[in-house]
Amino acid sequence: MNNVLIVSVIGPDRSGLVEQLAATIAAKNGNWLESSFSRLAGQFSGIVKVAVIGAGEEVLLALQQIAGLDIRGVLDVEREETALVSQSVALSLIGHDRVGIVKDVATILARFAVNIEKLETWLSSGAMSGEMMFHAQLILSAPLDVDLDQVHRQLECIADDLMVEWAD
C-alpha cells in the first residue's frame, strides 16, 4: 500500500502555478497521481492526489511555502479496490437557472444513495430567450440495485423545463 496525500489548493490565479506545485512535489520525491484544477472568478482552485514516502509532511510543508496559496492536505492510505458494489453513470442536466437547483438535484441523488463523484456546472445565455440556462455534467456512483428510471423521473420533477439525460 502507498501513502497518499490529498492536497487542496486555492488562491489568486497566475501563470506558472501548476509548474510550481509539480516542481515542489517532485523535489520532495512525491509522485503526482491525479488532479483536477479550475479557474473560477479569478481564483485558481483544485485538488491533487500525491503518492508520498512516509507521512508526507515534508511535501505538504513545502507546498504550503508557495506564496499566495491556501494549501491543505489529508494523508490517507491507498486501498485496493474492493468488489464492485456500485455502477458509474454520467448525467447531463440543462434547464432555466434558478436559486436552489443544485440543492434540489443533490437532495434527490442522496435520497437514492447516489454519490456525486464529479460535478461541473456553468451558465449560458439561452439561444432564443436570452434567459440564463443552467448546465451540469455529473459523474455518479450509484448502487447496483438503484432504479435509474426512478431517479430520472424525480430529477425531471424539479422543473418543467429541466432536461435530464443519462450519458454513455
Please name every model-derived segment.
Residues 1-168:
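A conserved regulatory-domain signal marking ACT and ACT-like small-molecule sensing domains
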